[in-house]
Amino acid sequence: LGYLGTCPTNIGTGLR
């Protein structure tokens, strides 16, 4: 879901 920096623009929870 983009929590561990996997998706910076997924849900706003990624760290790129």
From Swiss-Prot:
Its EC number is 2.7.3.4. Residues 1-16 form the Phosphagen kinase C-terminal domain. It catalyses: taurocyamine + ATP = N-phosphotaurocyamine + ADP + H(+). GO terms for molecular function: ATP binding; taurocyamine kinase activity. It is an enzyme of class 2 (transferase). The keyword Cell membrane does not apply. Keywords: ATP-binding, Kinase, Nucleotide-binding, Transferase. It comes from the Eukaryota. InterPro entries: ATP-guanido_PTrfase_AS, ATP-guanido_PTrfase_cat, Gln_synth/guanido_kin_cat_dom. Belongs to the ATP:guanido phosphotransferase family. This is Taurocyamine kinase. It comes from Arenicola marina. The lineage of its organism: Eukaryota, Metazoa, Spiralia, Lophotrochozoa, Annelida.
